[in-house]
Amino acid sequence: MKYNKLVDHTLLAPQATVHDIDKLIDEAIKYDFKSVCIAPTWIKHAKEKLAKSDVLVCTVIGFPLGSNATSVKVYETKIAIAHGADEIDMVINIGRFKNKEYEFVLNEIKAIKEECGSKTLKVIVETALLTNEEIAKVTEIVMQSGAEFIKTSTGFSYRGASFEDVEIMKRVAQDKLLIKASGGIKVGDDAIKMVELGANRLGMSKSIQIMEDLEKK
């Protein structure tokens, strides 16, 4: 298993400087990670730095709360792609979902997917704020949307992905939707277990330590 190609090497801290982003990019090139996941303000810079590599540029939309107007999220997506983003990780409107406004949530995801075109869309549902039943329901919604991935977490709530989150998503989605586990993956065994349970992508800020841990196994 080439775990490096499952990794979205992530730095979304608001205080991240260009020096921090360059370090992230250099690490991603060295380890040949799937992507760097960064704030929209750094897309152009990352795209230029990664021009001669296979590492993709992933960014976030409606992040981290998800409560922007749909039109704002769509416009954010348009600008992100124009600046060179290869993959989009959007946050659903969590309050609307918990209010059982399922059609609103579905239509918003569809609108952003339409703007993405052939670019990969991952839908962040913030499992820390959902019951197990809600995780199953939101997985069903994402399956109907045309998005490629469902993603567990922003990394900005009180916890990241749990093994149970991924188990529920996999049970509902089976092979009809890819799963990104993000946040809370701290050691190599966490990464291994997430993949065994069905995760197809791992969003991690501790990617280097985890890769070093995996190399020892």
Swiss-Prot record:
The record's subcellular location field reads: Cytoplasm
Q: Which cysteines are joined by disulfide bonds?
A: none
Recall the GO molecular function terms of this protein's record: deoxyribose-phosphate aldolase activity
Role = Catalyzes a reversible aldol reaction between acetaldehyde and D-glyceraldehyde 3-phosphate to generate 2-deoxy-D-ribose 5-phosphate.
Chemical reaction(s) catalysed? 2-deoxy-D-ribose 5-phosphate = D-glyceraldehyde 3-phosphate + acetaldehyde
Q: Which UniProt keywords apply?
A: Cytoplasm, Lyase, Schiff base
Q: Which gene encodes it?
A: deoC
Protein family: Belongs to the DeoC/FbaB aldolase family. DeoC type 1 subfamily.
* Pfam families, alphabetized: DeoC
SUPFAM superfamilies in UniProt: Aldolase (SSF51569)
- The protein's organism comes out as Metamycoplasma arthritidis (strain 158L3-1) (Mycoplasma arthritidis)
- Catalytic residues (UniProt): D89, K151, K180
Query: What's a GO biological-process term for it?
Result: carbohydrate catabolic process
Q: What is its EC number?
A: 4.1.2.4
InterPro entries assigned? Aldolase_TIM, DeoC, DeoC/FbaB/LacD_aldolase, DeoC_typeI
Q: GO CC annotations?
A: cytoplasm
This protein is called Deoxyribose-phosphate aldolase
The record's section on HAMAP family has:
DeoC_type1
